[in-house]
């Protein structure tokens, strides 16, 4: 991965996604040097994780937000709740600053939407017991006479065109999703269950997770949310647990603490994220990445450091270190005008290390996109 040792002159939106892949081998620093024990094995394991999100049922679920007539297309309290606590594995923190403003906004929006007080339900009670199906005649979802869950709604899922993401006609059912409301007077809570088969003969459970939230004050001054559950393709399973908390919600500079853990069973990988987001004012954001780590066997690859950003101009500075078992492996430094990715002792990444490095970052971007699809349909329904 030998490239010219010059800053990358790219627009911020491209530099955000591209500097990791392009600036990988400039030599100008010294220090202790770690090595991956098996970079090719790490790449192989990371690539295998994609399978947890490849079931046809999961893909069909991801299309619900855009399907005409879908009951999850209208904003409501539920969207705010789900957007506030995404179960997204960060893009292996290639650009942790990129999603930070959106995450803060989602948390503030959720607190605002829910600020009227935690209600006894997230889904309107008038929708309880409903089942929604695709109608080929009108090319949209319609309410079915079939009964749904007593405390929520059911939506039948159909095969989609892999190119357009639209439901194929004539429709072919591939599973169903249920949104179950477990809210209490003190906590908004929603469970999402994604299954193959039919309601009368359920098949594989591809996802089962819950999101809950509480708000302090009216208008709100603090907000907290938790999320937990699993995603599977029937062979691989990714389980997760997360907590999100924001203070100073009633100002233009809220502070946020995020703690998330993921565990993948095949291959066995453990992921942790601990970070804080702080705003000195409405335009300046500082992210402190305490830990983003991936553990595989006896080896832990972890990232830590800081990113500061000016939201109005998209200017940013980044200073991160990637360790292998607590010994520095890679340093990432730069601004929106250019960044470098190199060993701390100045040596180039080997081709195998370079591939593992890219897989570490960009496979997690794939996971992020896939898991976002878990929240987008319900998020639209709930007001996100």
Q: Predicted regions span which residues?
A:
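N-terminal "mature head" segments of proteins
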Residues: 27-153, 324-384
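Processing junctions and N-termini across compartments
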Residues: 17-20
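Intrinsically disordered, low-complexity segments enriched in Gly and acidic/Ser/Thr residues
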Residues: 237-353
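Long, acidic/polar, low-complexity amphipathic helices and coiled-coil-like
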Residues: 109-234
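Bacterial N-terminal signal peptides that target proteins for export
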Residues: 2-15
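Edge beta-strand at a domain terminus
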Residues: 205-214, 243-244, 375, 384
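C-terminal motif of bacterial Sec signal peptides marking the signal peptidase cleavage site
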Residues: 22-25
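Generic "edge-of-domain/loop-turn" microfeature
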Residues: 164, 184, 199, 267, ...
């Amino acid at each position: 991965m030998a490239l010219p040792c010059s800053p990358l002159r790219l627009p911020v939106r491209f530099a955000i996604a591209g500097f990791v892949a392009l600036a990988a081998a400039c030599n100008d620093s010294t220090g202790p040097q770690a090595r991956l024990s098996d970079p090719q094995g790490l790449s192989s394991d990371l690539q295998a994780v994609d399978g947890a999100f490849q079931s046809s049922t999961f893909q069909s679920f991801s299309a619900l937000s855009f399907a005409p007539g879908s009951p999850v297309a209208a904003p409501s309290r539920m969207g705010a709740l789900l957007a506030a606590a995404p179960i997204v594995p960060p893009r292996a923190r290639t650009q942790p600053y990129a999603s930070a403003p959106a995450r803060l906004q989602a948390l503030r929006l959720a607190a605002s939407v829910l600020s009227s007080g935690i209600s006894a339900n997230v889904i309107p009670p008038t929708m309880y017991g409903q089942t929604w199906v695709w109608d080929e005649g009108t090319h949209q979802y319609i309410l079915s006479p079939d009964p749904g869950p007593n405390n929520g709604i059911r939506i039948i899922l159909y095969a989609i065109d892999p190119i357009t993401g639209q439901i194929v006609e004539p429709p072919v059912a591939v599973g169903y999703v249920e949104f179950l409301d477990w809210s209490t007077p003190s906590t908004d809570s929603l469970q999402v269950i994604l299954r193959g088969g039919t309601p009368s003969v359920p098949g594989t459970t591809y996802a089962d997770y819950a999101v809950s939230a509480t708000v302090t004050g009216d208008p709100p001054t603090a907000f907290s949310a938790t999320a937990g559950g699993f995603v599977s393709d029937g062979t691989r399973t990714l389980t997760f647990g997360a907590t999100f908390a924001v203070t100073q919600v009633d100002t233009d500079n809220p502070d946020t603490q995020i703690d998330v853990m993921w565990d993948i069973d095949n291959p066995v990988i453990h992921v942790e994220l601990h970070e804080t987001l702080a705003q000195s004012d409405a335009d300046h954001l500082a992210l402190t990445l305490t830990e983003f780590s991936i553990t595989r066997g006896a080896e832990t690859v972890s990232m830590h450091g800081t990113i500061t950003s000016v939201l109005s101009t998209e200017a940013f500075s980044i200073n991160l270190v990637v360790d292998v078992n607590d010994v520095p492996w890679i340093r990432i430094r730069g601004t929106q005008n250019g960044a470098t990715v190199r060993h701390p002792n100045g040596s180039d990444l080997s081709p195998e290390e370079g591939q593992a490095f890219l897989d570490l970052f960009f496979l997690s971007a794939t996971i992020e996109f896939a898991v976002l699809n878990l929240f987008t349909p319900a998020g639209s329904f709930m007001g996100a």
